[in-house]
C-alpha cells in the first residue's frame, strides 16, 4: 500500500474511534435502558482505534522511520519529530487500554453501574480518552505538516 493510502486509513479509523467514543459518552450521559447499544458502540470505537494503531504502526516501520523522519529532521521544523512524534509514540500506548476499559464498563448491568456510582467517573474517563485521541491527531497533523514544509 502507498503512503497516502496508509495515512488516510490510519486517520480514518482514528476518526471512527473518536466518533464512536463520543457517541458512547452521550449514551452514558443519557443512561439508556437498553445496554446492548453501549456495547456495540464501545466495540466499534475500540475496533477503530485498534485498526488505526495497527495501520499507523505499519506505516511508521515501512515509511516514516526510513523515509519521512530524515526529511523532517533535516527540514524547517525538526522539532516536529523531536516533540510531536516522540510524544505521540508514547501517548498512543494509552488509547487501547482506555478503550478496553470503556468497553468493560459498558458490560456492567444498569444496576451494577448505578450502585457503583460510576456515571461521573465514566463520563470524565471517556471524555479524557477522546481528548487524548484528539491531541494525538493534532500531533499527527504537526508531523505531516512538517514533512510537507521540508
Could you describe each region identified by the protein language model?
Residues 1-150:
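Polytopic transmembrane helical bundles with strong interfacial aromatic enrichment
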Amino acid at each position: 500500500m502507498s503512503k497516502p493510502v496508509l495515512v488516510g486509513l490510519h486517520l480514518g479509523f482514528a476518526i471512527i474511534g473518536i466518533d464512536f467514543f463520543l457517541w458512547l459518552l452521550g449514551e452514558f450521559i443519557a443512561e439508556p435502558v437498553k445496554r446492548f447499544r453501549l456495547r456495540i458502540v464501545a466495540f466499534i470505537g475500540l475496533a477503530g482505534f485498534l485498526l488505526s494503531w495497527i495501520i499507523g504502526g505499519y506505516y511508521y516501520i515501512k515509511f516514516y522511520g526510513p523515509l519521512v523522519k530524515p526529511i523532517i529532521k533535516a527540514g524547517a521544523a525538526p522539532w516536529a519529530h523531536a516533540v510531536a512524534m516522540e510524544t505521540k509514540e508514547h501517548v498512543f500506548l494509552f488509547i487501547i487500554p482506555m478503550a478496553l476499559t470503556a468497553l468493560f464498563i459498558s458490560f456492567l448491568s444498569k444496576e451494577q453501574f448505578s450502585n457503583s456510582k460510576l456515571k461521573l467517573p465514566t463520563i470524565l474517563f471517556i471524555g479524557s480518552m477522546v481528548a487524548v485521541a484528539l491531541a494525538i491527531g493534532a500531533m499527527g497533523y504537526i508531523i505531516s505538516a512538517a514533512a510537507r514544509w521540508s
